[in-house]
């Protein structure tokens, strides 16, 4: 029985899920983004080299997917910061880096647009903000 496909699918699902959550949480609290970016990049490259050195194919697949996911997450830290500037992700007013973003970019917000109840229709930005602050 060949389990490489299942192994690859599960590894991709869980590593992407972990990366998404980790980037949001780490970027939210980190006073600089270069440190987590460097760590994720270095670990990603190391895991990729480990994947290349493995003889066991399923393990090589797992490490290859984990490595490339970590490398992409390193790139995502700067993209997440851009989402905060544009108001697409919440800023953390307790984070000095985010505090500067809130001052410099009128579109930045502390409202988490993912923490809302859907109303089943399109709403304008004013009503969206009202819906977010009501709950």
Regions inferred by a protein language model and the residue ranges of each:
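Hydrophobic, membrane-inserted alpha-helices
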Residues: 19-20, 40-50
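Alpha-helical transmembrane segments and their cytosolic membrane-interface
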Residues: 1-17, 25
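Hydrophobic alpha-helical transmembrane segments of multipass integral membrane proteins
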Residues: 9, 13, 42-46, 63-70
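C-terminal ends of transmembrane helices
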Residues: 18-28, 74
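Loop-to-helix transition at the N-terminal end of transmembrane alpha-helices
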Residues: 29-44
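C-terminal membrane-adjacent module
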Residues: 96-135
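Alpha-helical transmembrane-segment detector that highlights a single hydrophobic TM helix
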Residues: 54-93
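Helix-coil boundary and interhelical linker segments in multi-pass alpha-helical membrane proteins
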Residues: 1-4, 53-57
């Amino acid at each position: 029985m060949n389990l490489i496909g299942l192994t690859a699918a599960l590894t991709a699902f869980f590593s992407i899920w972990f990366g998404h959550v980790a980037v949001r949480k780490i970027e939210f609290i980190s006073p600089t983004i270069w440190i987590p970016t460097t760590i994720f990049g270095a670990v990603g490259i190391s895991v990729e080299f480990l994947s290349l050195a493995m003889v066991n194919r399923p393990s090589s697949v797992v490490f290859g997917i984990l490595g490339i996911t970590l490398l992409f997450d390193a790139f995502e830290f700067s993209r997440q910061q851009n989402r905060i500037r544009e108001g697409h992700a919440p800023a953390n007013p307790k984070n000095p880096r985010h505090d500067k973003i809130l001052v410099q970019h009128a579109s930045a917000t502390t409202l988490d647009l993912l923490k809302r109840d859907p109303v089943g229709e399109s709403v304008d930005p004013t009503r969206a903000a009202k819906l977010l602050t009501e709950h």
